[in-house]
C-alpha cells in the first residue's frame, strides 16, 4: 500500500473546485487523511520539511497526546507518506517522505487547505472517513 492507492470519493472533487488538475490531491486525501491528527501531522511535517521529530516532540508540537498520533505515524510510515528511522539511542524519528511526489502533493494539500471552500471539503472528507471507522 502506498500514499496514492485509494481513489477519490466521487463527491466534491478537488479538481472541480480548483480547475487545475488536482486529482492526485483527491486520491491522497481520501487515502491518507483518516483523522484530524493525520491532518495535523501532515501539515506539521510539510511546514517543517527536512526536520525530523520523535513521537514525544511531535505530540508536544501538535498539542496532542502520544497515543493519539502514534498509530497515525505508523500508518503513514507504512504508506510511505513519512520516513521513520531509529537513531543511535533507539528513538524513532519521523520526517516527511523524501519521495518527490509525496512532497509535491503534501505541499499542494497545505496550499489548498488555505482556501476556505477547499478546506471545508477536506474537513467533510475527514469527518466522513472518521464516521466510517
Predicted regions and their residues:
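N-terminal acidic, proline/glycine-rich, low-complexity intrinsically disordered segments
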Residues: 1-9
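Amphipathic alpha-helical dimerization/coiled-coil segments
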Residues: 104-133
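Short acidic, hydrophobic short linear motifs in intrinsically disordered regions
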Residues: 41, 51-61
